[in-house]
Amino acid sequence: MKKLIAIVAGEPNSINSEIIAKSWKQIKNKNNLFIIGNYLLIKKQINQIGLKIKISKINSINEIINKNNLNVLNIPLKFKSTFNINKIDTKNYVIKCINMAHIMACKKIIKGFVNAPVNKNIFNGKFLGVTEYLANKNNVKEKEVMMLYNRK
């Protein structure tokens, strides 16, 4: 199997699902991509905004069969409203998604991951963002790097 790249769904109370869905439609080579997030939430959010994309729920990357579907590695999340999830559940969900991607990257199950935007308040002021959170988890002090690209 090709080395996979994960996309961490990020903040559930946002337009991340829309960005992921619209980007998915534009991507030609989908062979090595999958999402880490809550399957039902992403499916309902995409349906709610009126986009038509085939989505598959997977519980392991070994279950990725249809490369044209948006494969979502399911992370549990209880919710009643698709864009109004309480702060504690949001925090726990986002941290679980990031930690899952981190574990998979450390075990070399995935080549790397990209995280969709998150509300920095989930880190309770301990970290500026995901980059610093991951640097801390890996005992990297003041050497964290963030890649940015701008055509201008």
Located regions from the model:
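Anion-binding alpha/beta catalytic cores of soluble intermediary-metabolism enzymes, centered on
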Residues: 1-152
